[in-house]
């Protein structure tokens, strides 16, 4: 089934819920939505939303939650870990499989595909999608990394993505 976590943070949040509801009805996919309260509790808004979202995942009875993180997300996570610290575990970024709790596993099947590859596939297959407008806000460090820093690294260093991903794989297996 599909699970939509409604954070209520964007003025478009209700529209996203409607989009997911209609798409799942059209594709005959069982659908469930969970509205969460994002409590900052000393966290930034992104971290607080992630905490609420993962709690909703943990409460879902499906056992396996598949997420759409892709290679670009993985590279951003690695680079952010490099500048924030956190050691080897943080630099290993996101594993393809991770135990969330005793009953729930997180699965990231798209980590080997770039955002561009996924966008091309979606366009070729006429798959509808939505984009969270907050992803364009470079006030968030991850977005600044995505739109400002990483393009410079990619221009300067041949095969940058391939090298970073090789390091991530090495860190995950060590």
Language model feature labels by segment:
Residues 1-148:
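Core alpha/beta nucleotide-donor-binding catalytic domains of modification enzymes
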Residues 139-174:
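ATP/NTP-dependent adenylation/nucleotidyl-transfer catalytic domains that generate, transfer
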